[in-house]
């Protein structure tokens, strides 16, 4: 405390004083009153960062922070829109942009610490109308609503029932339900919900882009742009200085059912609903829904959801077929893994952003592996493949969705069999022939099942009767390769999709009985037996051929006999056919190499895989290698079919 004219007044905490002083010095620098050197700006930025949790604590600090930002926006221009920061800038300073980084910290601090339920009420007069002008870049510009008296009423699914079967990634996190409403930057929206949702873990999310980008080396938008307000009363006031779509977060095991939510002082955004309880008609879409001004559009069914920029879709004509196609793909995935077609939340949730959320493609809720340029002019009818449907180009999406399903695998298959879902989508969902579906599932439509088998049979490991290499090295013969999951597609070719569906369904049933299998190292012999049980045939020779050998073949054979699982003539015939495909001279090998490397084979690549491996073997492969491969395959045939072709 300090004494002032005989009165006792409460002094600002030291942290507030330092924070205020730092922001004041930055403002004076912007106005040219007291110029700072780069290092001095960095010093003030460090003080702000250290005290950032106090930036939303008082009316004075919030007002000062917005005043500082407004000063910068008037003088230089908003972040990501001014000349220096358009398109983003490096997170680590290499000289220059010191002030921009400091103001980035201020903006992020306001979002993180000023926009809380208590502060919206306590500092409403300050926050009402307070907006970041960078919002015109991301998430997008939109005019303020016509007035708080305009109320939109929407239906949402306020239930998220318990999941059935083995755990799936993000199944127990809150489900996100679009409302078709958008909060304009600077506005305060009031959301009214039924009493059944109060104090039950529900929330209101403003801004769909929920991934935290703080680890990204390049800053292209604020790291955290989405704010969640817990629903603790029938009416909740929400705000976000960037604006954002309004969503209801439904907690796991919530059971409020279909409810109606009222939203006041928001603008509408395009929302195509293919949900069972609320379907947007094509006429509604064309005449009104796609024309709403909110900068992000939502598409949602009971099985699939995505957000894309409104600039992509305001002339898009047929979301009905699009969503039917996405639902078809979701059904193919659910059937493959023996899961119900309608789950506790959508099977897949996709979101476009200005940057990948990770340093590569990742699964997630949402899966955010799709970039756009917010400053690029669009025609309202984007040719992005997300709007062409999953049959267009979905191999990456379904690879990541495979990871998200946490299903059981043989050892070493983690980065191989996750491509299988897209084979099912294309073949079972859209009637693409199996070979083409297999090839496209890992972006190489020229790799058929037979070519994948040859890619395995020409290796030294096959000739020597060894399993496929699953080491963590470039010599690995399974990960990111068609031959690594060819065994599953082979089962489909011979027996149809049902054995795989029944197998993974049995894994779910076992889980419900308390029996769990290691998802990335399912015991080999147990897995072969259970897969054989689902196929109604002894799959040992087929799986052995594809590089996974039984650990105790004698014991496994007894188990097969005990269950009446007999050798299959289909497998026998297939192995004999593969014997005829083995290249028997250098010319045959060269033709195979050309097929699986259609762009040519360049020298200088790693000699242990891919082009590099073929570059090494092109001059070396000869008849002796072909004969050794034939002998190795004959050993497999003799081991499992000692009496020749089975009857049947």
How does the language model describe each region?
Residues 1-7:
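Bacterial N-terminal signal peptides
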Residues 11-133:
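Intrinsically disordered, low-structural-confidence terminal and linker regions
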Residues 12-30, 35, 131-137, 520-648:
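Beta/coil-rich, acidic/histidine-enriched accessory regions frequently appended to metallopeptidases
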Residues 122-270:
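Beta-strand-enriched, solvent-exposed domains that form extended recognition/catalytic surfaces
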Residues 245, 251-302:
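Exposed low-complexity, polar/acidic, P/S/T/G-rich flexible segments that act as propeptides
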Residues 284-493:
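Catalytic cores of extracellular degradative/oxidative enzymes
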Residues 306, 449-555, 564-568:
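Active-site-proximal alpha-helical
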């Amino acid at each position: 405390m300090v004494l002032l004219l005989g009165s006792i007044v409460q002094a600002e905490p030291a942290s507030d004083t330092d924070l205020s002083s730092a922001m004041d010095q930055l403002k004076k620098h912007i106005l040219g009153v007291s110029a700072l050197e780069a290092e001095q700006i960095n010093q003030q930025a460090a003080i702000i960062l250290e005290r950032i949790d106090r930036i939303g604590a008082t009316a004075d600090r919030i007002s000062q922070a917005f005043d500082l930002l407004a000063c910068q926006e008037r003088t230089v221009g908003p972040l990501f829109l001014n000349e220096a920061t358009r398109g983003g800038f490096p997170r680590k300073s290499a000289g220059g942009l010191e002030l921009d980084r400091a103001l980035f910290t201020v903006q992020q601090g306001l979002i993180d610490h000023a926009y809380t339920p208590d502060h919206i009420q306590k500092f409403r007069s300050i926050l009402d109308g307070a907006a970041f002008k960078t919002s015109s870049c991301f998430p997008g510009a939109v005019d303020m609503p016509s007035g708080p008296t305009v109320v939109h009423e929407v239906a949402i699914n306020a239930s998220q029932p318990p999941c059935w079967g083995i755990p799936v990634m993000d199944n127990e996190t809150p489900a996100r339900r679009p409302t078709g409403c958008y909060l304009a930057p600077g506005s305060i929206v009031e959301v009214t919900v039924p009493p059944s949702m109060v104090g039950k873990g529900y929330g209101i999310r403003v801004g769909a882009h929920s991934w935290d980008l703080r680890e990204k080396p390049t800053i292209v938008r604020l790291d955290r742009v989405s704010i969640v307000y817990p629903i603790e009363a029938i009416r909740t006031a929400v705000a976000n200085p960037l604006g954002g779509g309004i969503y209801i977060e439904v907690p796991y095991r919530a059971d409020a059912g279909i409810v109606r939510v009222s939203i006041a002082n928001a603008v509408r955004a395009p929302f195509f609903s293919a949900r069972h309880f609320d379907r947007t008609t094509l006429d509604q879409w064309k005449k009104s829904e796609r024309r709403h001004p909110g900068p992000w559009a939502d598409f949602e069914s009971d099985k699939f959801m995505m957000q894309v920029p409104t600039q992509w879709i305001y002339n898009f004509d047929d979301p009905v077929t699009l969503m039917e196609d996405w639902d078809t793909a979701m059904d193919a995935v659910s059937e493959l893994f023996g899961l119900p077609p309608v789950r506790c939340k959508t099977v897949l949730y996709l979101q476009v952003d200005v940057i990948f959320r990770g340093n590569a493609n990742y699964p997630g809720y949402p899966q955010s592996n799709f970039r756009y340029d917010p400053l690029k002019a669009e025609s309202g009818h984007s040719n992005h493949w997300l709007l062409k449907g999953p049959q267009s180009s979905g191999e990456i999406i379904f690879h990541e969705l495979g990871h998200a399903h946490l299903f059981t695998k043989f050892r070493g298959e983690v980065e191989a069999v996750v491509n299988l879902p897209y084979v099912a989508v294309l073949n079972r969902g859209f009637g693409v022939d199996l070979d083409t579906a297999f090839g496209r599932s890992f972006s190489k439509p020229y790799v058929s099942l037979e070519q994948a088998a040859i890619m395995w049979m020409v290796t030294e490991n096959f000739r020597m009767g060894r399993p496929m290499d699953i080491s963590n090295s470039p010599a690995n013969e399974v990960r990111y390769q068609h031959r690594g999951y060819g065994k599953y597609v082979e089962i489909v070719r011979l027996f149809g999709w049902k054995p795989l569906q029944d197998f993974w369904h049995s894994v779910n049933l076992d889980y419900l009985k308390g029996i769990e299998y290691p998802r990335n190292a399912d015991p080999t012999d147990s897995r072969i037996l259970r897969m054989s049980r689902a196929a109604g045939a002894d799959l040992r020779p087929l799986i052995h051929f594809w590089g996974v050998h039984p650990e105790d073949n004698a014991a496994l054979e007894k188990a097969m006999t005990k269950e009446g699982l007999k050798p299959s003539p289909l497998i026998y015939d297939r192995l004999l056919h593969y014997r005829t495909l083995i290249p028997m001279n250098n010319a045959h090998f060269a033709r195979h190499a050309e097929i699986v490397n259609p762009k040519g084979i360049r020298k200088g690549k790693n000699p242990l895989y891919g082009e590099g491996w073929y570059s090494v073997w092109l001059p070396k492969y000869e008849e002796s290698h072909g004969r050794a491969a034939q002998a190795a395959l004959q050993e497999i045939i003799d081991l499992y079919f000692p009496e020749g072709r089975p009857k049947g």
